[in-house]
């Protein structure tokens, strides 16, 4: 006999950056584990220091960090933590990115532009990530940017079941805010047995976050319309889409999105909108300035925790959604 056999069992360790500790703590609670104590702070010049207070040698490590504002700081912190885990001899490192930063920069729209979503994936791989686990990427092709497995989770079951339980389904119409979201909206229609409508929009390519809404395709008159999107950033697109639906006779509009980015003028736009309710998951923390009266936040932690367990136990993440 050659070599050495060990009797040690696999060990799961969960680490968190400082961007969204509430979500990390809830994921840990769902898994029945504690977060690994971590010392992290900023030096006077803005550099980030990280040190884990427990050994990660030989462990299957899961590092959770959502890319919220200030996004560049938290992306960098995650990369530094990845490097620390790699140098600590972790057996495997899975990066949990509930909201994947730079996802909208997934292709070149014009010459001399970067593909920043690919750059983020390359940086994670170089820093030490073996696997990425994320929720509702802006576009599916981002999964191919990372040189390794990518587990793509979906918030649709959580959001759709919430809406379906509170709205008379006979009056429900699912609305895609643009042509790019039609496939997702179609899955909503299948789940809730509801018709589909589409808001056709056109962006001004020279002005960031500027949207002009043109027309509504489908019957929305007298209907409770549910606008479905992956993220709400400044709120311009979705509020303009809601206005178009009301102008075409919608009885009510509910907005759902996985990621509530809510930057800049979003707080005022949501507050002043005729939309009755905005429904998000907690992939990102809700900014303090946002009025919560019209906002419902659903927990994505159980979904992430189940996926982590499947990865750790060499199970199937896909099966979590095939059953639904």
Write out the residue ranges for each language-model feature.
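PRPP-associated nucleotide enzymes
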Residues: 1-324
């Amino acid at each position: 006999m050659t070599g050495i056999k060990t009797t040690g069992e696999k060990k799961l360790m969960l680490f968190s950056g400082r961007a969204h500790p509430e979500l990390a703590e809830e994921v840990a609670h769902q898994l029945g584990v504690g977060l690994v104590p971590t010392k992290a702070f900023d030096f006077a010049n803005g550099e980030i220091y990280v040190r884990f207070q427990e050994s990660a040698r030989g462990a299957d490590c899961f590092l959770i960090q959502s890319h919220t504002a200030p996004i560049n700081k938290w992306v960098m912190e995650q990369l530094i933590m990845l490097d620390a885990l790699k140098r600590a001899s972790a057996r495997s490192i899975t990066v949990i990115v509930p909201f994947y930063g730079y996802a909208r920069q997934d292709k070149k729209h014009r010459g001399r532009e970067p593909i920043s979503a690919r750059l983020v994936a390359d940086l994670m791989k170089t820093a030490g990530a073996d696997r990425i686990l994320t929720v509702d990427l802006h576009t599916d092709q981002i999964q191919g940017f990372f040189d390794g497995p990518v587990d793509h989770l979906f918030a649709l079951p959580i959001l759709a079941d919430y809406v379906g339980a509170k709205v008379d389904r006979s009056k429900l119409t699912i609305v895609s805010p643009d042509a790019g979201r039609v496939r997702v909206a179609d899955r909503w229609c299948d789940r809730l047995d509801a018709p589909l409508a589409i808001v056709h929009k056109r962006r001004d390519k020279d002005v960031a976050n500027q949207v002009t809404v043109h027309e509504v395709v489908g019957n929305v008159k007298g209907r409770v319309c549910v606008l479905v999107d992956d993220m709400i950033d400044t709120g311009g697109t979705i509020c303009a889409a809601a206005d178009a639906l009301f102008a075409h006779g919608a009885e009510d509009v509910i907005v759902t999105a996985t990621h509530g980015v809510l930057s800049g003028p979003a707080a005022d736009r949501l507050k002043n909108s005729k939309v009755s309710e905005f429904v998000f998951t907690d992939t990102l923390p809700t900014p303090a300035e946002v009025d919560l009266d019209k906002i419902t936040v659903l927990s994505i932690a159980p979904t992430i925790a189940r996926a982590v367990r499947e990865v750790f136990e060499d199970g199937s993440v896909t099966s979590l959604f095939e059953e639904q």
